[in-house]
Amino acid sequence: MNGGHIQLIIGPMFSGKSTELIRRVRRYQIAQYKCITIKYTNDTRYGTGLWTHDKHNFSAMETTKLLNIIDAVTDFSVIGIDEGQFFPDIVEFCEYMANNGKIVIVAALDGTFQRKPFTTISNLIPLSEMVVKLTAVCMKCFKEASFSKRLGTETEIEIIGGEDMYQSVCRKCYINE
């Protein structure tokens, strides 16, 4: 075995996926691994770099297509990817990198605001050595929340936003609203 593998962190909005991604990458940095994080270019909510919802920042390379940056990340042992659901080539990239000895850590939503799967992330699950599903706190009743609910009426899947546009909700509150 070449040591390469895929770790997948999934869950709804506000469940701490980006925070967990940063935590894992930092641990590898402490262990002297050469690490890089990648964020989706169109995610400009808080500025440059990778941001958590509680405003912690971590430097990150930006792209909209992962396969375009293969040469730029070849020298790194650990590759962290935030907002993985937005990359159309996430499956091919992760599989290629893991097969070539890289540790790939992906943080992604597992479902849309309509509770439909992000197909690329669903396809990444059977290729991953480790899958963790995080939960958030329901912003209505304060119980465990597994779903993201959009506050507006837009129907497009890719609308990037924070608490101004989305809430984490439990099943009961998702259905009753």
UniProtKB/Swiss-Prot annotation:
DNA repair keyword on record: no
EC number: 2.7.1.21
Sites where the protein binds ATP: G11, P12, M13, F14, S15, G16, K17, S18
Keywords, in A-Z order: ATP-binding, Disulfide bond, DNA synthesis, Kinase, Metal-binding, Nucleotide-binding, Transferase, Zinc
First-tier enzyme category under EC: transferase
Residues that hold substrate according to the record: F113, I157, E158, I159, I160, G161
Organism superkingdom: Viruses
Binding of Zn(2+), residues: C138, C141, C170, C173
Gene3D superfamilies: 3.30.60.20, P-loop containing nucleotide triphosphate hydrolases
GO molecular function: ATP binding; metal ion binding; thymidine kinase activity
Catalytic activity line of the entry: thymidine + ATP = dTMP + ADP + H(+)
BP GO terms, sorted: DNA biosynthetic process; thymidine metabolic process
Active site (record annotation): E83
Family per record: Belongs to the thymidine kinase family.
Function comment: Phosphorylates thymidine and thymidine analogs, such as azidothymidine (AZT). Part of the salvage pathway for pyrimidine deoxyribonucleotide synthesis.
Subunit structure of this chain's protein: Homotetramer. Two molecules of substrate bind to each enzyme tetramer.
Protein name (Swiss-Prot/TrEMBL): Thymidine kinase
Organism per entry: Raccoon poxvirus (RCN)
The gene coding this protein: OPG101
